[in-house]
């Protein structure tokens, strides 16, 4: 396909080449341009591959983080069930009576609120 294009370029030139030196110079320029284009395409493919690899690694890291956070959520839900149960069994026997609700403080065991 490229050779056919090259033949067309040579066949439709406005004036015939003046000498072999001119042909050689044109061929050299064409080859140089092709080599630069080949190198640029190779670099582009390399960058594309590196970006895909980087995105794959980032995706795997996010999957692991997501899994860890889902585990933390599950653990916190279990803790909530347990504490709700403890509170419901304690309230009927509590001798202090109802008190004013205090400001909700972060849970001490939660890693989010530790400094």
Swiss-Prot record:
Keywords: Activator, Cytoplasm, Differentiation, DNA-binding, Nucleus, Repressor, Transcription, Transcription regulation
CDD domains according to UniProt: bZIP_BATF (cd14701)
Signal sequence, renumbered to the chain: none
Matching InterPro entries: AP-1, bZIP, bZIP_sf
Basic motif: annotated segments: 29-51
Region annotation (Leucine-zipper) ranges: 55-83
A Pfam family the protein falls into: bZIP_1
GO annotation, biological process: defense response to protozoan; DNA damage response; DNA damage response, signal transduction by p53 class mediator; hematopoietic stem cell differentiation; isotype switching; lymphoid progenitor cell differentiation; myeloid dendritic cell differentiation; positive regulation of cytokine production
Alphabetized SMART domains for the sequence: BRLZ
Any one GO MF annotation of this record: RNA polymerase II cis-regulatory region sequence-specific DNA binding
Gene3D superfamilies cross-referenced by the UniProt entry: 1.20.5.170
Domain bZIP: 27-90
Compositional bias annotation for Low complexity: 13-22
Region (Disordered): 1-60
Primary location recorded for the protein, binned into one broad class: nucleus
PROSITE patterns noted in UniProt: BZIP, BZIP_BASIC
SUPFAM superfamilies on file: Leucine zipper domain
Compositionally skewed regions (Basic and acidic residues) per UniProt: 47-60
One Gene Ontology term, aspect cellular component: nucleus
Location of this chain's protein in the cell: Nucleus; Cytoplasm
Function: AP-1 family transcription factor that controls the differentiation of lineage-specific cells in the immune system: specifically mediates the differentiation of T-helper 17 cells (Th17), follicular T-helper cells (TfH), CD8(+) dendritic cells and class-switch recombination (CSR) in B-cells.
Similarity remark: Belongs to the bZIP family.
Protein name: Basic leucine zipper transcriptional factor ATF-like
Organism from which the protein derives: Xenopus laevis (African clawed frog)
């Amino acid at each position: 396909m490229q050779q056919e294009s090259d033949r067309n370029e040579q066949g439709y030139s406005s004036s015939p080449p003046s000498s072999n030196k001119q042909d050689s110079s044109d061929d050299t320029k064409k080859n140089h341009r092709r080599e630069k284009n080949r190198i640029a395409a190779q670099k582009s493919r390399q960058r594309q591959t590196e970006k895909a690899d980087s995105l794959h690694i980032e995706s795997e890291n996010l999957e692991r983080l997501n899994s860890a956070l889902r585990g933390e959520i599950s653990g916190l839900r279990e803790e909530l069930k347990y504490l709700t149960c403890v509170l419901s069994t304690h309230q009927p026997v509590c001798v202090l009576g109802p008190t004013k609700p205090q400001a909700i403080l972060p849970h001490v065991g939660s890693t989010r609120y530790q400094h």
